[in-house]
Amino acid sequence: VWEDASNKIAYSERRRYFGGGELDSVMNYPLRDAILAYLNGGTAEHFAETMETLRENYPRDVFYNLMNIIGTHDTARALTVLGVMSEDWKKSRDERAHYELPPDRLETAKRRLRLAAVIQFTMPGSPTIYYGDEAGRQGFEDPFNRRTYPWGAEDREILAFYRRLCEVRADSETLIRGELRFDTGENDALLRYERTLGRSRIIILVNRSRQEVRTGVNALYALDLLTQREFDCEDSSGIEITVPAETAYLLRCFGSAE
């Protein structure tokens, strides 16, 4: 199911996938599309609206059990989508078959891929990795996206980042079961949302722009789960955080500013 599965119509018939007798989950293509659109220049507000529509339309158990993807056997590789120019899609089939991102575009794509993975791993649902994405595999549409895993030639930097995300996700019941709340409107380029479970609170900040972004966090102390960097409150107004360009923070927050 490539779109919102709650109102899917196929062969002139409305599908009842979530009526209790058919599907427990689907591949979350709307999330994939929203992530890639946001990272390629879309707004944080549009991303949030897309996710809120899914949350409204899907049963809660389904929403928290979706296969959260950024790549599959039916789509171009995420690294390629995040690095190519619009005119590259017009290349001949033979050119696409042998295409590799030039060094400058590859570095841009790698930074964006890390942001995509952060969103994938921190939204409700089950993060599902298409083999090779975690190793820096490139490729346009089928069959170029189905090359074998690059054994011995993995991008070690990307692989290490994915491993760290897996550790953070596995260790956090808040990211697995917590409530979701978006906080948008402050900056089109800054995607900001919060996962909460009881007293546990994690704020995710994703800055897709090429400039740093400053934002406030209502906490006395925060720890970035990816890097273990600490942030302290300097006054009663909370913590002022500068998110570097094309960077994400996963902030476990403690306390509340007055």
Residue ranges and their predicted role:
Residues A109-K110, T122-I129, D133-E258:
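Carbohydrate-interacting/catalytic domains
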Residues R15, N68-L101, A117-R156:
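Aromatic/acidic polysaccharide-binding cleft in carbohydrate-active enzymes
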Residues N57-Y64, L106-R114:
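Structural motif
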Residues V1-L66, I119, G136-R164, R195-G198, ...:
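Active-site-proximal helices and loops of the catalytic beta/alpha 8
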Residues A44-E52, D88-L113, D171:
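Aromatic-anchored helix/helix-loop segment that forms the rim or "lid"
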